[in-house]
């Protein structure tokens, strides 16, 4: 009975993995399709990869999306980590409940509501301060707003489970609290920070709804360009670009996982040596 249950769970796991990754493999396969029809196989060809470099609209949108994703992920990681430290290390302070609610709100708020409220905010700020102009800046600010919540929740969970006695021991030996945090606590929560950055990068790169509200003329992200092309039919060079992005993201994730695993093994070894 137990073996049958394990086999059933394994089958469900394989089915879920197939649903996730077979469409990606099909997309990569059709990026080498010689036919201009995206769903009709016409032979193997790399034509669409060569034509991709001449599609200025797609390349500019992809570059803008990467700039937005990197900028917003970095900003969200900084703000989210600081918020997580405040919530974990300072159990009681005025406005803690309000801060917790503000951090959690973007997680449950529909994207269309977030987009509308951000648009109204930027319009009001433009009328009062003549800043910011709708475009790259407004997209980054909006993405930082909803990505910070994911960083805070992730880092807060890791920080709450960290052994604070190590940091206290460092301070007892004369280390400044800031130095103790940077050299003791920060390496412990580094995997959570890196994971949060990758999550925010993916969310920002994939966002369509919020970006559509807060973007301006000449600031179309890649999801916006692809969505506009869907109405007329997706060209095969979109498959080529998507394949390149999938491969690049895969390399980044594997590299980050290897680096985090290496750092974790080194930290465990140093801890064992210190205990001996």
Please state what every model-predicted region is.
Residues 63, 67-79, 83, 182, ...:
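Hydrophobic alpha-helical transmembrane segments of multipass integral membrane proteins
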Residues 2-11, 19, 86, 95, ...:
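C-terminal transmembrane helix and the adjacent membrane-cytosol boundary/short C-terminal tail
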Residues 37-42, 46, 95, 112-146, ...:
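Membrane-interfacial helix termini and adjacent extracytoplasmic/periplasmic loops
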Residues 5-13, 82-118, 167, 274-275:
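Cytoplasmic-entry segments and transmembrane alpha-helices of multi-pass inner-membrane transporters
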Residues 12-24, 151-156, 162-163, 177-206:
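Transmembrane alpha-helices
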Residues 1-56, 60-63, 67, 255-276:
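N-terminal, non-cleaved signal-anchor transmembrane helix
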Residues 2-5, 36, 49-60, 205-258, ...:
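Interhelical loop and adjacent transmembrane-helix boundary motif
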Residues 1-6, 70-103, 124, 254-261:
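Transmembrane-helix boundary motif in ABC transporter permease subunits
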């Amino acid at each position: 009975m137990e073996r049958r249950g394990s086999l059933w769970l394994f089958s469900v796991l394989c089915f879920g993995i197939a649903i996730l990754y077979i469409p990606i493999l099909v997309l990569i396969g059709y990026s080498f399709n010689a036919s201009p029809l995206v769903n009709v196989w016409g032979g193997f060809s790399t034509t669409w990869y060569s034509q991709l470099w001449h599609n200025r609209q797609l390349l500019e949108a992809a570059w803008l999306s990467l700039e937005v994703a990197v900028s917003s992920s970095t900003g969200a990681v900084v703000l989210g980590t600081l918020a997580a430290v405040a919530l974990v290390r300072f159990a009681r302070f005025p406005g803690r409940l309000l801060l917790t609610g503000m951090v959690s709100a973007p997680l449950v708020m529909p994207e269309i509501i977030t987009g509308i409220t951000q648009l109204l905010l930027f319009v009001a700020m433009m009328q009062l301060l003549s800043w910011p102009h709708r475009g790259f800046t407004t997209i980054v600010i909006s993405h930082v707003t909803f990505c910070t919540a994911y960083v805070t929740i992730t880092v807060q969970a890791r920080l709450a489970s960290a052994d604070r006695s190590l940091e206290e021991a460092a301070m007892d030996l004369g280390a400044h609290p800031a130095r103790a945090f940077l050299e003791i606590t920060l390496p412990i929560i580094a995997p959570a920070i890196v994971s949060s950055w990758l999550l925010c990068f993916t969310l920002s790169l994939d966002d369509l709804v919020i970006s559509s509200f807060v973007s301006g003329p000449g600031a179309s992200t890649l999801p916006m360009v692809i969505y506009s092309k869907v109405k007329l039919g997706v060209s095969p060079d979109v498959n080529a670009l998507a394949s390149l992005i999938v491969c690049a993201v895969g390399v980044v994730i594997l590299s980050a996982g290897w680096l985090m695993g290496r750092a974790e093994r080194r930290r465990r070894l140093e801890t064992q040596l210190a205990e001996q």
